[in-house]
């Protein structure tokens, strides 16, 4: 066990310091914004320092473990720890949240509450990724929903209450299945109930019971990921939410579903995962094509980007179902890659709305000349979204593609068919990405703003855009930087399916 509680400090620091926001003067919006930004930067630096100096990349076992008895009556432990699977999402969470707080500077209504909720969400997400106890994982998973619901219902478009209610109904419905699965696994078998990940990973279940547990967890994670047909909350939520909230939703929240699928369904329930993986691959391939063909019909800019997110999540599902080192590494790389790309696209969609007050593509046009910086950034990020070689999306999708082709678990003809469907999805992606650019930036200017002389991206917006773009280019050129974090852990997970 680790002697110094690094992870507890990392989890608790944002919400504890965030609660002090309410002690700052009400009129001091600027002070409060700088305070929130400083908390996020300090947290990111602390996380980076901890991982650089106290984490060994070549060790697939859980590191920095903390194990404190919390509630004696229930024998409930505060168990934290990280491995190669959780280190990437935790760093991604810190990076995206820091930039989202900077993106949220135009928010003036109830700004104190807004920034506190962002920091509370930050704590919940890091807690979910670093939990080593199933009940603690569930509590963090649920705790994180409260600030998300409030951010969606209080700031955003005219239908924000409808979209927030839809979001909470879907996620709360999924959480019921998650709770049943957690309690079922914890209470099964041994005389002493345990919820420790390490103990549960070595426990075996009757196949029928394992399948029941698997389905429960799958429904909960399918809502978050999302997997069709449980995806309908996502376009509505993205269409109405403030763009800094969209950055957190697209960049981190969806990835929690993928993380749960690998951490619980793959690691704890490998026999059931073997049975369900062909179905996951088929659903993933259908999802890529369905979302990519639905996206061009969306006139709302943010809804179009939301459907592109659903399509890209299909690659993660296929990677998880491929049961191969290459495929799972590709899925983890896609989690990180799409975190940056999705957050950047929603940020730029929001900044364009700030200027022209329009979200519908058929009302735009000719924006390239008055807004050249926005045009350049959105063009590059659209290329990243459609997996242009040299950018992170290309490497991730290519690894998933090779992962399914080289998988030893499937026959040749099904593999060729799935690869063909994935290729169709890759062809459909440029259609909605490039048509979005054409409708926004080319042709005649269709809109009238009260003041024709509106400004292009300022220094703050350029800084956020470039900060999101640099990792996309960096991962595209040198993907080993991310893959080296998870490769040992991935080998350990996949070995269960061949030697167990």
From Swiss-Prot:
Documented EC number(s): 7.1.1.-
GO biological process per UniProt: ATP synthesis coupled electron transport; electron transport coupled proton transport
Catalysed reactions, semicolon-separated: a plastoquinone + NADH + (n+1) H(+)(in) = a plastoquinol + NAD(+) + n H(+)(out); a plastoquinone + NADPH + (n+1) H(+)(in) = a plastoquinol + NADP(+) + n H(+)(out)
Membrane topology: Multi-pass membrane protein
Entry's localization field: Plastid, Chloroplast thylakoid membrane
A GO molecular function held by the record: NADH dehydrogenase (ubiquinone) activity
InterPro entries from the UniProt entry: NADH_Q_OxRdtase_chain4 (IPR022997), NADH_Q_OxRdtase_chainM/4 (IPR010227), NADH_UbQ_OxRdtase (IPR003918), ND/Mrp_TM (IPR001750)
Keywords: Chloroplast, Membrane, NAD, NADP, Plastid, Plastoquinone, Quinone, Thylakoid, Translocase, Transmembrane, Transmembrane helix
Entry keyword annotation includes Chaperone: no
Major site of localization recorded for this protein: plastid
Membrane spanning stretches: 4-24, 37-57, 87-107, 111-131, 134-154, 167-187, 208-228, 242-262, 272-292, 305-325, 330-350, 386-406, 416-436, 462-482
Claim: Plastid is one of the keywords in the record: yes
GO cellular component, one term: chloroplast thylakoid membrane
Family that this chain belongs to: Belongs to the complex I subunit 4 family.
Protein's recorded name: NAD(P)H-quinone oxidoreductase chain 4, chloroplastic
Species: Oenothera parviflora
Gene, per the UniProt record: ndhD
């Amino acid at each position: 066990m680790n002697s110094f509680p690094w992870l507890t400090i990392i989890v608790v620091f944002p919400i504890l310091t965030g609660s002090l926001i309410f002690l700052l003067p009400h009129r001091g919006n600027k002070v409060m914004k700088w305070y929130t930004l400083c908390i996020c930067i300090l947290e990111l630096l602390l996380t980076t320092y901890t991982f650089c100096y106290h984490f060994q990349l070549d060790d697939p076992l859980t590191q920095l473990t903390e194990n404190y008895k919390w509630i004696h009556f229930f024998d409930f432990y505060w168990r934290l720890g990280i491995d190669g699977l959780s280190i990437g999402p935790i760093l991604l969470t810190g990076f995206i949240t820091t930039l989202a707080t900077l993106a949220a500077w135009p928010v003036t209504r109830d700004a104190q509450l807004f920034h506190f909720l962002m920091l509370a969400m930050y704590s919940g997400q890091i807690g979910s990724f670093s939990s080593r106890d199933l009940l603690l994982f569930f509590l963090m998973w649920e705790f994180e929903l409260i600030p998300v619901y409030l951010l969606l219902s209080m700031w955003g478009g005219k239908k924000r209450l409808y979209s927030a209610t839809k979001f909470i109904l879907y996620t709360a419905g999924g959480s019921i299945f998650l709770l049943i699965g957690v309690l079922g696994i914890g209470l099964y078998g041994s005389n002493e109930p345990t919820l420790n990940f390490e103990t549960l990973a070595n426990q075996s279940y009757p196949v029928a019971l394992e399948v029941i547990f698997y389905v429960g967890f799958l429904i909960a994670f399918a809502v978050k990921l999302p997997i069709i047909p449980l995806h309908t909350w996502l376009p509505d939520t993205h269409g109405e939410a403030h763009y800094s909230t969209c950055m957190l939703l697209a960049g981190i929240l969806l990835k929690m579903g993928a993380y749960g699928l690998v951490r619980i369904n793959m690691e704890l329930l490998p026999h059931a995962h073997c049975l369900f993986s062909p179905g996951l691959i088929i659903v993933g391939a259908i999802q890529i094509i369905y979302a990519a063909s639905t996206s061009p019909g969306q006139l709302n800019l943010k809804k179009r980007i939301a459907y592109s997110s659903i399509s890209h999540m299909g690659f993660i599902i296929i990677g998880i179902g491929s049961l191969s080192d290459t495929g799972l590494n590709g899925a983890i790389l896609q989690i990180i890659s799409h975190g940056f790309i999705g957050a950047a696209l929603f940020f730029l969609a929001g900044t364009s709305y700030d200027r022209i007050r329009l979200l519908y593509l058929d009302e735009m046009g000719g924006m390239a000349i008055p807004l050249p910086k926005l045009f350049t950034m959105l063009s590059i990020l659209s290329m990243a979204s459609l997996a242009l070689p040299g950018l992170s999306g290309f490497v991730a999708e290519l690894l998933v593609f090779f992962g399914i082709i080289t998988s030893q678990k499937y026959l040749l003809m099904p593999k060729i068919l799935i690869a063909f469907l994935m290729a169709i999805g890759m062809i459909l992606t440029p259609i909605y990405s490039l048509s979005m650019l054409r409708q926004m930036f080319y042709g005649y200017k269709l809109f009238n703003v009260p003041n024709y002389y509106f400004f292009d991206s300022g220094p703050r917006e350029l800084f956020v855009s470039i900060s999101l773009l640099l990792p996309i280019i960096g991962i595209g050129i040198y993907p080993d930087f991310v893959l080296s974090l998870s490769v040992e852990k991935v080998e350990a997970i996949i070995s269960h399916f061949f030697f167990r």
